[in-house]
Amino acid sequence: MASRESGGSRAAALLLVLGVERALALPEICTLCPGGMHNLSRVAAYCEDTSKLMQARCCLNQKGTILGLDLQNCSLKDPGPNFLQAYTAIIIDLQANPLKDDLANTFRGFTQLQTLILPQDVPCPGGSNAWDNVTSFKDKQICQGQRDLCNSTGSPEMCPENGSCASDGPGLLQCVCADGFHGYKCMRQGSFSLLMFFGILGSTTLAISILLWGTQRRKAKAS
């Protein structure tokens, strides 16, 4: 009997430790706002429908990757520096916050985002052309279906010959160099030499240090 109780205590302690470790590993953006996720929010519904984990304000997969973020009614004027931790999110709710109008660069890198819920007076990042559907309600605005603008007419021509267009978030594009090319306009061929880069950086730093040392010595002698 004592053995069973001892085993049960160990199991409970192990579960407690695992729970603490999971809590400690929770991304900071998930606890930006006190309390848990709103039960009737679209993020909570998505999390339940896909059998994902709900922790604080986040919906996570088994690896701890953020798939949903519910920061509605958090008195946020700006999503903050940790918002980038949610770049893997598929759905984000920011309604009922006094956000600033321009959020274009806030969502740079959010290439997986498919549903974004904003205050009614805040436009969808990238404008209506960056989304399949933009729906306005009395208290919120919903941006759905992020478009890949690289597929739009004329967009691929913005990249050089050895580069290709890639989405970088709602309404945002970037040029990615093809394999074997790098540098300005992807014109340099071959692998990027880290040894050469750090060699040049080290030489430049050494030269500046010697120059500053010489200047200080001359000032010291003059005084």
UniProtKB/Swiss-Prot annotation:
The chain crosses the membrane at residues 194-214. Its main location: nucleus. It is found in: Nucleus envelope; Cell membrane; Lysosome membrane. InterPro entries: ATRAID (IPR042350), EGF-like_dom (IPR000742). One of its GO terms (cellular component) is lysosomal membrane. The keyword Ubl conjugation does not apply. Residues 215-223 are cytoplasmic. It is a single-pass membrane protein; Multi-pass membrane protein. Residues 146-187 form the EGF-like domain. Keywords: Cell membrane, Differentiation, Disulfide bond, EGF-like domain, Lysosome, Membrane, Nucleus, Signal, Transmembrane, Transmembrane helix. Residues 26-193 are extracellular. The keyword Cell inner membrane does not apply. Residues 1-25 form the signal peptide. Promotes osteoblast cell differentiation and terminal mineralization. Plays a role in inducing the cell cycle arrest via inhibiting CCND1 expression in all-trans-retinoic acid (ATRA) signal pathway. In osteoclasts, forms a transporter complex with ATRAID for nitrogen-containing-bisphophonates (N-BPs) required for releasing N-BP molecules that have trafficked to lysosomes through fluid-phase endocytosis into the cytosol. This is All-trans retinoic acid-induced differentiation factor. It comes from Mus musculus (Mouse). The lineage of its organism: Eukaryota, Metazoa, Chordata, Craniata, Vertebrata.
